[in-house]
From Swiss-Prot:
GO cellular component, one term: nucleus
Name of the gene encoding the protein in the UniProt record: Nradd
Listed name of the protein: Death domain-containing membrane protein NRADD
Keywords: Apoptosis, Cell membrane, Glycoprotein, Membrane, Nucleus, Transmembrane, Transmembrane helix
Pfam families: Death, TNFR_16_TM
Death domain residues: 143-222
Keyword hit for Zinc: no
Chief localization: membrane
Residue positions with a glycan: 4, 37
Extracellular side: 1-52
Length: 228
């Protein structure tokens, strides 16, 4: 019986030694160091493979960051250029303040009269009468002119005079809503034209619409009026 037990122990030792031999077969000694056996089913990654991927990732990340920075810089440059163009256009548009003051709101008020020559004083005892400004004649004379312009048909009234003075139809419609449209017309014309709103210009426009009666009122000197 002892013989059989010893025999079993020998077999066990032999089996264990065989398993150890199989395990050792997976590693090959090289200079005292163990290296993996290349005949394995799943060969391990070569040493340093993971460290070689890191520079690639860093290069890709740097490329993405540089692309974003370039895009932001381009957008900022383009936005600044557009603001400069808008500011330049606004400067050109507002570069003539005298023009805006002279014409006012172009959608309502008058354009410059066409074909009207500047006032040139003529010779004679009343040489300066034609060059007098409408606003410089007496108030009573102005009111009489306005009263006559309200009477009669529109073509020969203040509407026709407005057309002769260069007003557009929409401006005439706006003035028609005023309580005294003739007064509004002559006041606006005198304010817009300034030194050009002379009696000669007004008389020429009245003659063109056949209102010689109003011309006579302008030509007749009023009592107690001093020539300016």
């Amino acid at each position: 019986m002892l013989h059989n037990v010893s025999k079993g122990v020998v077999y066990s030792d032999t089996a264990l030694k065989g398993q150890d031999g199989d395990r050792e077969g997976m590693w090959v000694g090289a200079g005292g160091a163990l290296a993996p056996n290349t005949s394995s089913l799943f060969p391990p990654e070569p040493p340093g493979a993971s460290s070689n991927i890191i520079p690639v990732y860093c290069a890709l990340l740097a490329t993405v960051v540089l692309g974003l920075l370039a895009y932001v810089a381009f957008k900022c440059w383009r936005s600044r250029k557009q603001r400069q163009q808008l500011a330049k256009a606004r400067t050109v548009e507002l570069g003539d303040p005298d023009r805006d003051q002279r014409h006012g709101d172009s959608s309502v008020f008058v354009d410059s009269p066409h074909g009207l020559e500047p006032c040139i004083p003529s010779q004679g005892p009343h040489a300066d009468l034609g060059c007098r400004l409408y606003l410089h004649i007496p108030q009573q004379q102005q009111e009489e002119v306005q009263r006559l312009l309200i009477l009669g048909e529109p073509a020969k009234g203040w509407q026709g005079l407005a057309g002769q003075l260069g007003y557009q139809a929409e401006a005439v419609e706006t003035m028609a809503c005023d309580q005294d449209p003739a007064y509004a017309l002559l006041r606006d014309w005198a304010a817009q034209e300034g030194s050009g709103a002379t009696l000669r210009v007004l008389e020429d426009a009245l003659t063109a619409i056949g209102r010689e009666d109003v011309v006579q009122v302008l030509s007749s000197p009023a009592e107690g009026c001093s020539v300016v």
